[in-house]
Regions:
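Alpha-helix-loop-beta-strand connector modules within alpha/beta enzyme cores
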Residues: 43, 47-66, 103-130, 143, ...
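Catalytic cores of alpha/beta
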Residues: 71-82, 133-144, 168-172, 184-210
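Active-site cofactor/substrate anionic-group-binding motifs, chiefly glycine-
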Residues: 36-90
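Glycine-rich, proline-tolerant flexible connector loops at the mouths of alpha/beta enzymes
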Residues: 28-48, 64, 91-107, 156-164
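Active-site mouth loops of central-metabolism enzymes
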Residues: 5-21, 60-77, 98-103, 125-137, ...
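Glycine-rich phosphate-binding active-site loops on the catalytic face of alpha/beta enzymes
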Residues: 61-67, 85-99, 147-164, 191-199, ...
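Conserved, mostly hydrophobic/aromatic
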Residues: 11, 49, 83, 126, ...
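Hydrophobic faces of well-ordered beta-strands that scaffold small-molecule active sites
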Residues: 6-14, 39-41, 58-64, 91-93, ...
Length: 233
């Protein structure tokens, strides 16, 4: 896999509430030079980043609580709406796992519906925190995420564990299943501990073995903060 192919699906990430304007300009300058799919930042940085980025590079805003997702639909909706007003093209939002036999249930459905409504017209990536879930829960949550209209299911924040090979297999299988059963093409975003080219190539090979059509920035993303240095070597 060549460097351009990786850049085309990369969400270059800087999630630091204390990031200075110089920090944000630095990541935007790198993005403008190398052309990733998106730059992913906290919602309070969206307006500044949008003004620094070239056209064609999306701004992805993390909204609604991170790394712990919010549990109030109104608060999540307002957070996402603020990010959209600031210029976000894409929204990354955590659906916080609950330690309950009814997870995912009606409460989680209401949160997902709020995320989708608030991000209408924008790309929505729902983070399900796979390191905290077993296989059954990963499958069930992914199906609910896709059924409520999210554009991508995203593995994890990376703050409570990383993206495993099994996560890539399960998420891509469920996205393929949704495409076959519902006729709707959705995407997978893999993030959490992805630092070197070999990580990307291995995970993409797993996705490709499930469904070769899950490719390109509209259906596959890699979220990483330090990967760029490695792939440019």
């Amino acid at each position: 896999m060549d460097t351009r192919d990786i850049l085309d699906i990369l969400d270059l990430t800087l999630l630091d509430h204390d990031a200075s304007e110089a920090d944000l300009r630095r990541i935007c300058d790198r993005a403008n030079e190398h052309g990733p799919a998106a730059v992913c930042v906290f919602s309070e940085h969206v307006e500044l980043v949008r003004g620094m980025l070239d056209d064609g590079i999306s701004v992805a805003a993390v909204a609604g609580g991170f790394p712990v997702g919010g549990d109030d639909a109104t608060s999540i909706r307002e957070s996402i709406e603020d990010a959209v007003r600031s210029g976000a093209d894409e929204i990354d939002c955590v659906l916080e796992p609950r330690d309950s036999d009814d997870f995912p249930g009606e409460q989680d459905l209401s949160l997902l519906e709020a995320m989708r409504q608030a991000s209408s017209g924008r790309t929505l990536k729902v983070i399900i925190e796979t390191p905290l879930l077993g296989e059954h829960a990963i499958r069930a949550v992914t199906r609910m995420v896709l059924a409520t209209g999210a554009d991508f299911v995203k593995s994890c924040t990376g703050m409570r564990g990383g993206c495993s090979d099994e996560d890539a297999r399960l998420l891509s299988f469920e996205v393929k299943r949704h495409s076959v059963t519902m006729g709707e093409e959705r995407g997978v975003k893999l993030s959490g501990g992805i630092r070197v080219r070999e990580d990307v190539e291995r995970l993409i090979e797993i996705v490709d073995s499930n469904e070769a059509d899950i490719s390109g920035p509209s259906r596959l993303r890699i979220g990483a903060s330090s990967l760029l240095d490695d792939i440019l070597r």
